[in-house]
Regions:
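Basic nucleic-acid-binding interfaces
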Residues: 2-38, 47-75
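Short, conserved DNA-binding cores of transcription-related domains
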Residues: 43-45
């Protein structure tokens, strides 16, 4: 979990420089699992809450995707 905390801090301080793989690790730690992929977009589902989030697979991720993830995990 320490690596996840470091990634969350990086997301807060530098939201424009995140890679999709890093965000996927954070989502996985909070109960999100890959639901499906269609083209360049991956959908992650939280089975406990039913929340569905879409992340575009581009490098680096746009700030809006990172901020959305932070809001959904409660950071």
């Amino acid at each position: 979990m320490p690596n996840i905390k470091k990634l969350i801090e990086k997301m807060k301080q530098q939201p424009n420089g995140m890679r999709p793989e890093e965000v996927e690790k954070v989502l996985g730690a909070y109960g999100y699992v890959p639901a499906r992929q269609k083209g360049s977009h991956k959908h992650y589902l939280n089975k406990e809450t039913g929340d569905l989030i879409t992340i575009k697979q581009e490098r680096p991720l746009k700030r809006a995707y990172v901020v959305d993830v932070l809001n959904r995990i409660g950071e």
